[in-house]
Amino acid sequence: MNTGIIDLFDNHVDSIPTILPHQLATLDYLVRTIIDENRSVLLFHIMGSGKTIIALLFALVASRFKKVYILVPNINILKIFNYNMGVAMNLFNDEFIAENIFIHSTTSFYSLNYNDNVINYNGLSRYNNSIFIVDEAHNIFGNNTGELMTVIKNKNKIPFLLLSGSPITNTPNTLGHIIDLMSEETIDFGEIISRGKKVIQTLLNERGVNVLKDLLKGRISYYEMPDKDLPTIRYHGRKFLDTRVVYCHMSKLQERDYMITRRQLCYHEMFDKNMYNVSTAVLGQLNLMNNLDTLFQEQDKELYPNLKINNGVLYGEELVTLNISSKFKYFINRIQTLNGKHFIYFSNSTYGGLVIKYIMLSNGYSEYNGSQGTNPHMINGKPKTFAIVTSKMKSSLEDLLDVYNSPENDDGSQLMFLFSSNIMSESYTLKEVRHIWFMTIPDTFSQYNQILGRSIRKFSYADISEPVNVYLLAAVYSDFNDEVTSLNDYTQDELINVLPFDIKKLLYLKFKTKETNRIYSILQEMSETYSLPPHPSIVKVLLGELVRQFFYNNSRIKYNDSKLLKMVTSVIKNKEDARNYIDDIVNGHFFVSNKVFDKSLLYKYENDIITVPFRLSYEPFVWGVNFRKEYNVVSSP
C-alpha cells in the first residue's frame, strides 16, 4: 500500500462517513497493479478491516476503463454489497460509469454461463477486457464457480481481485488454487503440496514456498486492523495450548449414548455429523438418524423417560435438568448472570436447531416473533428472546440483523441471543456483542476467525474498553481433566484416538493452525509498501476524504485559509489548481459532517467558507422519498 497517503492524515476521525487511510492507500496499490499493470491481486486483509469498501471503491475507479464483474457467495451478501455500493458512491467524489459494474451471486453467475451444466464458451467473450472481483475467494474452489473462474482466466487473460480474510480454509490446497488463478502459469499441485495420511499432514513444501514467492511477488496486499481500535478479548475456561477452553463434563446419560455412537462409527467420527450432534446433546434414537424429517413426524415418541418428541416438538423435564447436554447445562447456568447480547455458533442446523429451540423455551427464553418461554425471563419489562439463523431462513436474515444490530438493542432487550450455523461465518457484521459462544468446535482456523470476526471488528462497539467474552465449549468425559500444554504430546494416533471428540477436533484445529500461520507469515512478508504521490485516478477521492476530515473540526474559516490550502497542495502541487479545487467544492456545496452542526454543506459567505447545517423536511403523509442510495443503482445483465 502507499504509505505516503497514510502520512497525509493526522488523527483521522472515524466516527463520520469516511474512507479510512489504509483503504485509500490500498486503493492506490490496486489501481497501479490491476489497472496499470494488468496483474491479479490477493487482498488479504484480516476480517473487520473494510475489504468490501476497498473493493467497491476500486470497482468505481476501474469502471471508467473496463467492465467490472463482482462475485459474492450468496443473495444475502449480494444485498450487503448493493447497500455498500451506495455508501461507496457517496464517498467517491469522482466520475464513474455505473453501467460497467455488474454484481452477481455465484448462483446467478453460474446460471448466466452454463447451459445444462456445460459452460457456454461462446458467451465468455463478454468478459474480454474486464476485471473480476471475487469476495470470499477461498470458498470458490472445488465447485463450478472455481472451474468457471479458471476457464475465464485462461480464455480471457484478465486480472482478478481476490478478497479473503483467510485464504487457507482447511489445507494449503486452497492457496494452491489461488496461486493458479492469479498467475499466468499452470500449477502442478503435486509439486508444491506434500500430503500425508491425514488432512493435518497436508503441507506447503519448500518448492511450494518458492513458487508462492515467485508467482505472487507484488500481488499481495496484507493488512490487519490495529488492536487499539478493537475491544479486548477475554477467553474463558482452562488453559489449552495458546487459548482457553471450557471443559463441559458429560453426565452418565450423555456419556453412555455418546460412547455408543462413537463405537458404531469405529473411529471415523471426525468425518461424521453424528459426533457433532452427540457432543452438543444426545437424543436417544435420534443420535444416529440421518433422516430426521421422518422421526420428526413421530407422535409422543419416548427418547428418554423424561424426554419425548411429538410432531417435531421436544418436551419433558430433561430439557431443564439437561443431563442430555453438558454444554447447554453450562450455557443455561452461565447466562443467568450475564448482561448484554450473545452470539452462539453451532453446526448441523436441523439437529442443532431442534435442540436449541426447545432447551431455550423450556428454560424461560422466548423465541423472537414466536413461542413464549416457560416462566419467561424478562429485561426492561419484555421477555428475553432468541433467534436461530440457518440457511433455511435466508429471506428473513437481513430484517433479523437489523433488529439485532439496532442501537435500541445494544442491551439485548429486543433480541438477546443469536444462534447461527455456518451461514453467519462470512461477510456479516454484528454490533455490540458481549458474549461469543462456540457450541461446536470449528473445522478450521479460518472458520474460527471468521466467526469471531463477525463481532470483533472496527465500528462494532461504541465502548471498546469493555471486553468481549469468548467461550469455547468442549464436551468431555466425566473423568477427563487432562492438561493440554503442547502439541508434541499428541503426535501418536493412539494418544489422540482415546480423547473426547471435541478435544480431538481442537488438537486437529491447532495442528492445522500451525501450518496456516506459517504460510500467512510468508504472505505478510510479501505484502509491499511504498511511498509515492497518489495515483492520478484517485486524486479526487483522496481530496474528498481530506476535505471531510478538515471540515469536521472547522465550522468557519477564511476563504484563503492557509491550512486548507496547505492540505490541498499536499496532493495538488500547483497552487492555482489547488485554489480552483477549493472553488469547486465550495460552489458545488460539498457535503461534510461537522462536529458542531453534523450534516452540513459548504458555502461561501462574504470572505469566509462556512458549514451550513441542513435537514430534509417533507409534508405529512408522503408515502416515501428515496433521499439516500440505499439500493444498488448498478444493473446486472
Curated annotation (Swiss-Prot):
Record's keyword annotation contains DNA-binding: yes
Where found, per UniProt?
Answer: Virion
Query: What's a Gene Ontology MF term here?
Result: helicase activity
Q: What class of enzyme is it?
A: hydrolase
- The EC designation for this entry is 3.6.4.-
All copies of domain Helicase C-terminal, residue ranges: 327-507
In this chain, ATP is annotated as bound at 45-52
Is Transcription regulation a UniProt keyword of this protein? yes
Write one Pfam family the protein is assigned to.
Helicase_C
What is this protein's function?
A: Acts with RNA polymerase to initiate transcription from early gene promoters. Is recruited by the RPO-associated protein of 94 kDa RAP94/OPG109 to form the early transcription complex, which also contains the core RNA polymerase. ETF heterodimer binds to early gene promoters.
Q: What's the protein called, per UniProt?
A: Early transcription factor 70 kDa subunit
From what organism does this protein derive? Vaccinia virus (strain Copenhagen) (VACV)
